[in-house]
Amino acid sequence: MSFGKAGTMHKWTLDEEQSGEVIRHALDLGINFFDTANGYSEGTSEEYLGRVLKESVARDKVVIASKVYFNPGRLSREAIMREIDGSLKRLGTDYLDLYIIHRFDYETPIEETMEALNV
């Protein structure tokens, strides 16, 4: 299942209303871990999740994970900083509990990527 605007890659995603229903039901069942990514449905997955969580639950009651990749700067420090800022804005929060690289980047030195993730 994926939340977000259906695009050319994933036409099976849930729209905002359906996403909200699923997220609220998950919260009602006690689910508190949500995973998304900067590239899921062109960022709308993060937007939908962020709006529902903001209206439904205190931020410290959920664990939010997001992932980074699929961007022009790959996994450079500059790209990671830009992408996490975008994810935080779309999610409507000032922190993530877990930030993951979506795929390994063979073109950026691993030291640069790891140092950026450790900020």
Please provide the spans of the model-predicted regions:
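Active-site beta-loop-alpha junctions enriched in small/polar residues
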Residues: M1, A37-G39, K67-N71, I101-F104
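N-terminal binding-site loop/beta-alpha segment at the start of enzyme catalytic domains
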Residues: M1-V62
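Structural preference for beta-strand elements that scaffold enzyme active sites
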Residues: N32-F33, K61-K67, Y95-L98
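P-loop/Walker A phosphate-binding loop and immediately adjacent motor/lid segment at beta-alpha junctions
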Residues: V57, V68, L117
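Glycine/proline-rich, positively charged
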Residues: N71-V119
